[in-house]
Amino acid sequence: MKMGNLISIFSSNSKENTIVPINDSSTWYPQPGQHISIRTFRELNRAPTSSPISTRTEMFLNGVLSRSTDDLLGEDNRQPTTLTQRQLTQEVSRRLLM
């Protein structure tokens, strides 16, 4: 059953020594009142680990979108994690289905 607003994410990544770009996309229909947290990572100079450059939490209540930023989240939610796009998609999908 589809409820809530449609959320679509598409990302594309092409590195110097790859011929085919890596693309990943996901579509979610969040349930009313469900929290969605999105962290964006950027790798510079092929660093061994990446840190989040932004965090956004969104919640839909009665069709109205409310947002908070990472400064409103607790310290436990700020731990940097390195995930591939596929791992991120799987983790978000898993949390949305809880």
From Swiss-Prot:
The keyword Chaperone does not apply. Keywords: Host-virus interaction, Inhibition of host innate immune response by virus, Suppressor of RNA silencing, Viral immunoevasion. InterPro entries: Gemini_C4 (IPR002488). GO terms for biological process: symbiont-mediated suppression of host innate immune response. Transmembrane segments: none annotated. Residues 69-98 are annotated as: Disordered. This is Protein C4. The lineage of its organism: Viruses, Monodnaviria, Shotokuvirae, Cressdnaviricota, Repensiviricetes.
